[in-house]
Curated annotation (Swiss-Prot):
GO biological process: negative regulation of DNA-templated transcription initiation
Organism field: Herpetosiphon aurantiacus (strain ATCC 23779 / DSM 785 / 114-95)
Superkingdom of source: Bacteria
UniProt feature coiled coil, ranges: none
NCBIfam families assigned to the protein according to its UniProt record, in alphabetical order: division/cell wall cluster transcriptional repressor MraZ
Subunit composition and interactions: Forms oligomers.
Name of the featured protein: Transcriptional regulator MraZ
Domain SpoVT-AbrB residue range list: 5-47, 76-119
């Protein structure tokens, strides 16, 4: 389970430290890909395989299914942690997420999001305005 948020420096080689408490959940390998909100998504390999199977089950005749495949698979990278618990963020993914020297790693239970520090702050700032509507919306789900 991945929980919490952590700000880390991205070095000149694009290396980002993954929080120590997240590393055991990534021991079987991981996949990094584009997210839906100008962020990156980091999946443990078992979760990625399940997600990929579900995406591949979507009919290729639907434009939205093709676009989802492009978003999730075209930029994806199969990665591993180095001895210091870091991953290398590929240049194309750093550019997509506008990550330069600071990144925020956030736990999303079964996967991890990686944000530029600036973009994450914008997301946090938007919560103040959106929280009441979100609370009302999720109440329909018994949350």
């Amino acid at each position: 389970m991945f929980l919490g948020e952590y700000e880390h420096t991205v070095d000149e080689k694009g290396r980002l430290a993954i929080p120590a408490k997240f590393r055991a959940g990534l021991a079987e390998g991981l996949v990094l890909t584009r997210g839906f909100d100008q962020n990156l998504l980091l999946y443990p390999m078992p979760v990625w395989r399940e997600l990929a199977a579900r995406i591949n089950a979507l009919p290729i005749t639907q434009p939205s299914a093709r676009n989802l495949r492009r978003l999730m698979f075209a930029g994806a990278s199969d990665l591993g942690l180095d001895k210091q618990g870091r991953i290398v963020l590929p240049p194309n993914l750093r550019q997509y997420a506008t990550i330069t020297n600071q990144a925020v790693v956030t736990g999303m239970d079964s996967f991890i999001e990686i944000w530029s520090a600036e973009r994450w702050q914008t997301v946090l700032d938007s919560f103040a305005d959106e929280a009441p509507a979100l609370a009302e919306h999720v109440s329909a789900f018994g949350i």
